[in-house]
């Protein structure tokens, strides 16, 4: 029984590591966003609803992927939450009237299209996805 448990834990840890290694994301913004780079703390503040602007004063509106490895990698890397905790914190903000839930879109192409056509929009997509018409922000 112990051996089976150890094998299960090892495989679970390996699969989580594999997902994190495969899911590399880039942060994109509408061309109206002044900054060419963004800090991890700015991203966390924007995507948790704590702030609606970057340090340079650019007003931004976050847009999300509905789910998947890239979504999970972004939340883990830049927000420090899993999807369940992330959505719960947003529901709390929405319920208390402090914020509106960010748009969640199906797929990288939809996120790129939305960000390209909406001033101040900021989102994330898979690193290998086409991203013409949007600005790629360097995360520092």
What name fits each language-model region?
Residues 24-140:
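Exported/periplasmic ABC-transporter solute-binding proteins
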Residues 16-23:
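Sec/Tat signal peptide C-region and signal peptidase I cleavage site
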Residues 1-4:
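Positively charged n-region of N-terminal signal peptides that target proteins for export
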Residues 6-7, 60:
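Alpha-helical transmembrane segments of integral membrane proteins
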């Amino acid at each position: 029984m112990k051996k089976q448990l150890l094998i299960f834990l090892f495989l679970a840890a390996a699969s989580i590591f594999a997902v994190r290694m495969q899911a590399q994301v880039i942060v994109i913004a509408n061309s109206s966003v002044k900054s060419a780079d963004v800090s991890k703390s700015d991203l966390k503040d924007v995507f948790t609803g704590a702030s609606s602007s970057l340090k340079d004063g650019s007003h931004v509106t976050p847009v999300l992927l509905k789910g998947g490895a890239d979504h999970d990698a972004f939340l883990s890397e830049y927000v420090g939450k899993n999807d369940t905790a992330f959505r719960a914190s947003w529901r709390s903000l929405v319920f208390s009237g402090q914020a509106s839930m960010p748009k969640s879109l199906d797929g990288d192409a939809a996120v790129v299209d939305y960000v390209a056509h909406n001033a101040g929009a900021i989102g994330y997509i898979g690193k290998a996805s086409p991203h013409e018409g949007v600005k790629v922000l360097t995360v520092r």
